[in-house]
């Protein structure tokens, strides 16, 4: 049986100094022999998705200690992508994922912790912790802070559900008065929690359920609801049990790499496609699989996207549907249940909480269980009161949404579309692929051909959109914004939001080697690989070039002759694959270090040290 890792620092005469330091943290003689479990928190007052986490780490710690473990809490950083959006702060968002993964590894390995509870929530925090969990491979349970309640605002006598993206769009839409924009701003983000649509944060927290690393309800139970407290308490108890099973019973099935296998990543990606999750999840699942030693690639995602239907549309794809509505329809296990009934799920896999995913579905899928407890759990409703306090209300819907024909979650027979909510496109402008969130694309533009309008920064594209230089039928190309070229692979929420505010959301396409916020909708194609800074063909596009997009056939094509592209490539090679004009962008040493080691979006923008020239 494997020895508890913590005994490296708690046992033996030569560890007297280490034990002395442990004693200074509050440990007693009786604690030296218990598993030491890291409570990996991410509390910060900068981020609404994390502002309520301050005391929750200690809540989990108390449960760990009551169950026979020793809990030690630390925090990671957390970047709010919405606040960092639209300026150079966004350069730091994706790099923060790797910094979080490293910091968790550093703390857990330096102090020889035996297991972890990862308290995450927002965009890069869950992926960063997930990468660390795969890398370290000790027992872990994920529990997130939970989704924000959707905002409510009355405009022109009618109530509207809304979220952060609505505030961005309204601010740039001249048809809204200043008073209406202010009302939307004040109502868009009413509570603590991750932004209320199927954006990146909520998508990732849902995917931890499909991977088998979090408890049912983790992705959809509101941050404000009292039911969410149960998830935190149970996580504390569960991680001690997992610890004992591994270290005392030699049960390797509880380890993250035993749970998050290739088939588990297929399950997670199938869920993502079915629920129209954020395109960023592709980037993060590829990175997590890399850390787990799982060969999960863009080709695998392409294969799944061709057979998994779109079973749910949530904001931004459907502006009046939010995570609270998904929860009412049975949450993530309801979507997994529909995938299972369609023969699209691997149900024999273990989870942290059940022997198999199939067992968990029998208990938690609202269409196959009669459990009053489960049904009450999924009737958890928003409180409708602005607050930054977790678990502060216990309202219930009168009934569940079990309509699988026209409801929030559909059966495969009544899917929103037979094609899933995400697609991978390949072509001469994206040899290694690119990603589009098809759930947010109007059916009328699934096939689109138009002239390119080329911009070499997000800022330049935003200026062009707001000043009327982009017109109906254009393909907006934003390049040199990839992992290396940005550096940091900025999100493009403002360009897509401004296209919508100008009435061009279903009249233009946007193509970039950067990425998109989970709040993005429209014909927005990101992660173009290879990126311009690495010699990708997106760097060869010129104004007026015709670009042909065919989502049903999964192709994207730059209609320029091969000999012309070869000539352009020679010219770019001579220039060193850089933007034509110097950008007013300060790139720090930290960001330059990130750029030196990162890889393309097609690989999850993971680090590859072989790129460094080390003597």
Curated annotation (Swiss-Prot):
Pfam families: ILV_EDD_C, ILVD_EDD_N. [2Fe-2S] cluster binds at residues 122, 195. GO terms for cellular component: cytosol. Gene3D superfamilies: IlvD/EDD C-terminal domain-like. PROSITE patterns: ILVD_EDD_1, ILVD_EDD_2. Mg(2+) binds at residues 81, 123-124, 491. Its cofactor is [2Fe-2S] cluster; Mg(2+). The active site is at 517 (proton acceptor). InterPro entries: Dihydro-acid_dehy_C, DihydroxyA_deHydtase, DiOHA_6PGluconate_deHydtase_CS, ILV_EDD_C, ILV_EDD_N, IlvD/EDD_N. Keywords: 2Fe-2S, Amino-acid biosynthesis, Branched-chain amino acid biosynthesis, Iron, Iron-sulfur, Lyase, Magnesium, Metal-binding. Its EC number is 4.2.1.9. GO terms for molecular function: 2 iron, 2 sulfur cluster binding; dihydroxy-acid dehydratase activity; magnesium ion binding. It comes from the Bacteria. SUPFAM superfamilies: IlvD/EDD N-terminal domain-like (SSF143975), LeuD/IlvD-like (SSF52016). Pathway: Amino-acid biosynthesis; L-isoleucine biosynthesis; L-isoleucine from 2-oxobutanoate: step 3/4; Amino-acid biosynthesis; L-valine biosynthesis; L-valine from pyruvate: step 3/4. It catalyses: (2R)-2,3-dihydroxy-3-methylbutanoate = 3-methyl-2-oxobutanoate + H2O; (2R,3R)-2,3-dihydroxy-3-methylpentanoate = (S)-3-methyl-2-oxopentanoate + H2O. GO terms for biological process: isoleucine biosynthetic process; L-valine biosynthetic process. Binds 1 [2Fe-2S] cluster per subunit. This cluster acts as a Lewis acid cofactor. The modification N6-carboxylysine is found at residue 124. Belongs to the IlvD/Edd family. PANTHER family: D-XYLONATE DEHYDRATASE (PTHR43661), D-XYLONATE DEHYDRATASE YAGF-RELATED (PTHR43661:SF3). Functions in the biosynthesis of branched-chain amino acids. Catalyzes the dehydration of (2R,3R)-2,3-dihydroxy-3-methylpentanoate (2,3-dihydroxy-3-methylvalerate) into 2-oxo-3-methylpentanoate (2-oxo-3-methylvalerate) and of (2R)-2,3-dihydroxy-3-methylbutanoate (2,3-dihydroxyisovalerate) into 2-oxo-3-methylbutanoate (2-oxoisovalerate), the penultimate precursor to L-isoleucine and L-valine, respectively. Homodimer. This is Dihydroxy-acid dehydratase. The lineage of its organism: Bacteria, Pseudomonadati, Pseudomonadota, Alphaproteobacteria, Sphingomonadales.
């Amino acid at each position: 049986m494997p020895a508890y890792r913590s005994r490296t620092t708690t046992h033996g005469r030569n560890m007297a100094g280490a034990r002395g330091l442990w004693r200074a943290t509050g440990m007693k003689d009786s604690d030296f022999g218990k598993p030491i479990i890291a409570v990996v928190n991410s509390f910060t007052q900068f981020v609404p998705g994390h502002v309520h986490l301050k005391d929750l780490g200690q809540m989990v710690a108390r449960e760990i200690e009551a169950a026979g473990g020793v809990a030690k809490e630390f925090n990671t950083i957390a970047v709010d992508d919405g606040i960092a959006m639209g300026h150079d702060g966004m350069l730091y968002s994706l790099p923060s994922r790797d910094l979080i993964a490293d910091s968790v590894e550093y703390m857990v390995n330096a102090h020889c912790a035996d297991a972890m509870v990862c308290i995450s929530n927002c965009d890069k925090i869950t992926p960063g912790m997930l990468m660390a969990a795969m890398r370290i491979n000790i027992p872990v349970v994920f529990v997130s802070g939970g989704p924000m309640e959707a905002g409510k605002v009355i405009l022109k006598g009618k109530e509207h559900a809304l979220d952060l993206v609505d505030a961005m769009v309204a601010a740039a839409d001249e048809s809204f008065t200043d008073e209406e924009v202010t009302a939307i701003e004040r109502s868009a983000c009413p509570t603590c929690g991750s932004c209320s649509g199927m954006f990146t944060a909520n998508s990732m927290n849902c995917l931890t359920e499909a991977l088998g690393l979090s408890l049912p309800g983790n992705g959809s139970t509101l941050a404000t609801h009292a039911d969410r407290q149960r998830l935190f308490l149970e996580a504390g108890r569960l991680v001690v049990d997992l610890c004992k099973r591994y270290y005392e019973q030699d049960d390797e099935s509880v380890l993250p790499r035993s749970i998050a296998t290739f088939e588990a990543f297929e399950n997670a990606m199938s869920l993502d496609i079915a629920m129209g999750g954020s395109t960023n999840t592709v980037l993060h699942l590829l990175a997590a699989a890399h850390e787990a030693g799982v060969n999960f690639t863009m080709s695998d995602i392409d294969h799944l996207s061709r057979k998994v239907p779109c079973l749910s549309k949530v904001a931004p794809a459907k502006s009046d549907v939010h995570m609270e509505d998904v929860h009412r329809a049975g949450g993530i296990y309801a979507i997994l249940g529909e995938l299972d009934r369609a023969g699209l799920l691997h149900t024999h896999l273990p989870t942290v909480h059940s022997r198999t995913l199939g067992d968990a579905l029998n208990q938690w899928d609202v269409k196959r269980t009669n459990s009053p407890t489960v049904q009450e759990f999924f009737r958890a409703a928003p409180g409708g009161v602005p607050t930054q306090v977790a678990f502060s209300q216990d309202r219930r819907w009168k009934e569940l949404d079990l309509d699988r024909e026209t409801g929030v979650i559909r059966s495969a027979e009544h899917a929103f579309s037979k094609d899933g909510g995400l697609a991978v496109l390949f072509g001469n402008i994206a040899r290694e692929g690119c990603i589009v969130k098809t759930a947010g694309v109007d059916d009328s533009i699934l096939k689109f051909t138009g002239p390119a309008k080329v911009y070499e920064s997000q800022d330049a594209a935003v200026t062009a959109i707001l000043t009327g230089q982009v017109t109906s039928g254009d393909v907006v190309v934003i390049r040199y914004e990839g992992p290396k070229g940005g550096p940091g692979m900025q999100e493009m929420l403002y360009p897509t939001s401004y296209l919508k505010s100008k009435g061009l959301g279903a009249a233009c396409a946007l193509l970039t080697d950067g990425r998109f916020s989970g709040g993005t909708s429209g014909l927005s194609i990101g992660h173009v690989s290879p990126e311009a800074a690495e010699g990708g063909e997106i760097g060869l596009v010129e104004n007026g070039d015709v670009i042909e997009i065919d989502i049903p056939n999964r192709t994207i094509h730059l209609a320029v002759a091969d000999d012309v592209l070869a000539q352009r490539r020679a010219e770019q090679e001579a220039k060193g694959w850089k933007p034509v004009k110097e950008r007013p962008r300060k790139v720090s040493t930290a960001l330059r270090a990130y750029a030196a080691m990162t890889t393309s979006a097609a690989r999850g923008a993971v680090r590859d040290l072989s790129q460094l020239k080390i003597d």
